[in-house]
């Protein structure tokens, strides 16, 4: 194992390097504040890279996650073995640093906060923001591993080896974070890294240990310079500024790291292309870059609850913002008027609309209503005449007319006896007195009765519920209230013998009885129009009868004249067309005349007397027989002709009758 001076250097060297780093870091911090205008702390590792071009930056020394891809393909198992050897030596070095308080005092006085800020920017590549809040021991181990990695390699191989180490650490830590979201935040880097170192120690080789021991001093000097510059810049920030600006520092640092990683990727790409790397390395490098960026964002999100535990107490959380109701937190619109209480006028309670009053001058009417005031709903058998009675203008009721009251009910037509009237007359002294035909009598038992002419009605008193019945006097188009009714009166007939009761029962009987809609009136005399029509009908029948008699008589006369004529004489041409001249006239008729004689002669021929006589007689008889046979042959045709003649006669007779009937109709 190398000596402590070889690893950390002497005190004189550290002081000289600290001065140089202080001057460089101060100028870098001024340039960073002027350029960005963001938080005072910024990203110290990035400021060192921008300000001091001669001094190597953290990215150049340790590399970026995006550079891991190319180095991993070329280094292989050598990088893993070197990394495990470096970690074993880093653990021994951390033990020595814990026992040496002088080294701690040489730095900014508080190594734990400085180590936290320093390692928050240097360790673990894309995920070093999430590891910035770990324990002091974990950060010191990261620092020592970084130093050992630098000493393991030459100047050309430093960047690749450091990239391999950081990518392995970031990938291992990302796997642990995805598996346990809650337990990963509580575990420190110190617990993870020893496990990895134990697994890799089994693969160590003695040759790699020797190479790492030779290369340590060169890298340790650079680490001391970077640590001293970072340690002196960090105390300048107060604790409160760190708490307030912690959230702002992380996104800025991550953005700047991505820029440097892009620049370094381009340089690595050029160097690897010179060495013959193909396009597959570029594709894998781009994928690794995207994965690291997403992991760094996820780690920064998970770190916020731990880092901001103090800021939550000072400034409150996001839940406190939406605690109030939407309606209460809404500020009033700029154009909307606001009342004294800060509420818009629309939300104020609407004021009641004042009553509309119209001033009108009307005369006041005072009426003497007496001591008692009663509300009366008159039945249909009572009525009141409001105008005074005057015999000159009195009009009696007509039975045919229907009398309707103010409510539309039909009044019983009792004429004078059921109407309350009043009149003005003068007494003996000449004073005007109001007189009525009705009066109310109050008996000793408290009951009352109404006497209207000769009729008596019982009066019943009942209280009224509520103040809904008022007495008004009409004043032009308005009404003037006078009193409120508290009691009401009802009237009923005193007995069934009264005329009013009889009228009521009769009216009910008339309503119940069915009236006959069709009435039959007796005929006092005969209608002259009907008699005239009947006389006309009789005359027409008589004329028709006379016409019939005349037609019958005419037919009888015609029949008598037509008896001597026959069809054989009227139509001689129908028979014997071969014969001509006078012989052709009615030959059939002549034959018919002698038919009877011929038959008699036949009887004589076949009689018993035929044997008697002379031979001459026999010869004559033969000749006659020959003639008869010839005549008999012609008889069938003659009979047929006779039948046709009879039919013709019959047809002719029918035709004549029809003519007569037509004449009769005419």
From Swiss-Prot:
Pfam families: Leo1. The modification Phosphotyrosine is found at residue 606. GO terms for cellular component: Cdc73/Paf1 complex; centrosome; fibrillar center; nucleoplasm; nucleus. Keywords: Acetylation, Activator, Nucleus, Phosphoprotein, Transcription, Transcription regulation, Wnt signaling pathway. Its main location: nucleus. The modification N-acetylalanine is found at residue 2. The lineage of its organism: Eukaryota, Metazoa, Chordata, Craniata, Vertebrata. InterPro entries: Leo1. This is RNA polymerase-associated protein LEO1. Residues 1-357, 547-583, 602-666 are annotated as: Disordered. Highly expressed in skeletal muscle and heart. Weakly expressed in placenta and liver. The modification Phosphoserine is found at residues 10, 14, 66, 151, 154, 162, 171, 179, 197, 205, 212, 220, 229, 238, 246, 254, 277, 279, 294, 296, 300, 607-608, 610, 614, 630, 658.
């Amino acid at each position: 194992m190398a000596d402590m001076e070889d690893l950390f250097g002497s005190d004189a060297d550290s002081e000289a390097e600290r001065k140089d780093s202080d001057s460089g870091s101060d100028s870098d911090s001024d340039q960073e504040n002027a350029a960005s205008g963001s938080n005072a702390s910024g990203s110290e590792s990035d400021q060192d890279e921008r300000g001091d071009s001669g001094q190597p930056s953290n990215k150049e020394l340790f590399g970026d996650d995006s550079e891991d891809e190319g180095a991993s393909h070329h280094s292989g198992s050598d990088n893993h073995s070197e990394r495990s050897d470096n970690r074993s030596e880093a653990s021994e070095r951390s033990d020595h640093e814990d026992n040496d308080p002088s080294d701690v005092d040489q730095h900014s006085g508080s190594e734990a906060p400085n180590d936290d800020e320093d390692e928050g920017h240097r360790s673990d590549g894309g995920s070093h923001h999430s590891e910035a809040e770990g324990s002091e021991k974990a950060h010191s181990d990261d620092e020592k591993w970084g130093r050992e990695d630098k000493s393991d390699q030459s100047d050309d191989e430093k960047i690749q080896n450091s990239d391999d180490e950081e990518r392995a650490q970031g990938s291992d830590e990302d796997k642990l974070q995805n598996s346990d979201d809650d337990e990963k935040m509580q575990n420190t880097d110190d617990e993870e890294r020893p496990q990895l170192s134990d697994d890799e120690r089994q693969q160590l080789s003695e040759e790699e240990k020797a190479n790492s021991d030779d290369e340590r001093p060169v890298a340790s000097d650079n680490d001391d310079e970077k640590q001293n510059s970072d340690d002196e810049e960090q105390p300048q920030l107060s604790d409160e500024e760190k708490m307030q600006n912690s959230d702002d520092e992380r996104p800025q640092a991550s953005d700047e790291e991505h820029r440097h990683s892009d620049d370094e990727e381009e340089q690595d790409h050029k160097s690897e292309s010179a060495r013959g790397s193909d396009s597959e390395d570029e594709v894998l490098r781009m994928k690794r870059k995207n994965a690291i960026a997403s992991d760094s964002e996820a780690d920064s999100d998970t770190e916020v609850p731990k880092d901001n535990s103090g800021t939550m107490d000072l400034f409150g959380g996001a839940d406190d913002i939406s605690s109030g109701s939407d309606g209460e937190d809404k500020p009033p619109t700029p154009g909307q008027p606001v009342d004294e209480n800060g509420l818009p006028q629309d939300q104020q309670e609407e004021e009641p609309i004042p009553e509309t009053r119209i001033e009108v001058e009307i005369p006041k009417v005072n009426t003497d209503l007496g001591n008692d005031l009663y509300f009366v709903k008159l039945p249909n058998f009572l009525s009141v005449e409001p105008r005074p009675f005057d015999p000159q203008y009195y009009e009696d009721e007509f039975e045919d007319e229907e009398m309707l009251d103010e409510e539309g009910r039909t009044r019983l037509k009792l004429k004078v006896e059921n109407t309350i009237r009043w009149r003005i007359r003068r007494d003996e002294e000449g004073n005007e007195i109001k007189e009525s035909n009705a009066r109310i009598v109050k008996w000793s038992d408290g009951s009352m009765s109404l006497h209207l002419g000769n009729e008596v009605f019982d009066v019943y008193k009942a209280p009224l519920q509520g103040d809904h019945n008022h007495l008004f006097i009409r004043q032009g188009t308005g009404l003037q209230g006078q009193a409120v009714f508290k009691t009401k009166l009802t009237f009923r007939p005193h007995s069934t013998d009264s005329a009013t009761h009889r009228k009521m029962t009769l009216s009910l009987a008339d309503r119940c009885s069915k009236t006959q809609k069709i009435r039959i009136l007796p005929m006092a005399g005969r209608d002259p129009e009907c008699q005239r029509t009947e006389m006309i009908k009789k005359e027409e029948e008589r004329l028709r009868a006379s016409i019939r008699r005349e037609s019958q008589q005419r037919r009888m006369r015609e029949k008598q004249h037509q008896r001597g004529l026959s069809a054989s004489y009227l139509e001689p041409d129908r028979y014997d067309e071969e014969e001509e001249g006078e012989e052709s006239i009615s030959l059939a008729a002549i034959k018919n005349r002698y038919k009877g004689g011929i038959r008699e002669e036949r009887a004589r021929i076949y009689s018993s007397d035929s044997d008697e006589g002379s031979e001459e007689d026999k010869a004559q008889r033969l000749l006659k027989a020959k003639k008869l046979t010839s005549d008999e042959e012609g008889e069938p045709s003659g009979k047929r002709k006779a039948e046709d003649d009879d039919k013709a006669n019959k047809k002719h007779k029918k035709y004549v009758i029809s003519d007569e009937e037509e004449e009769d109709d005419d």
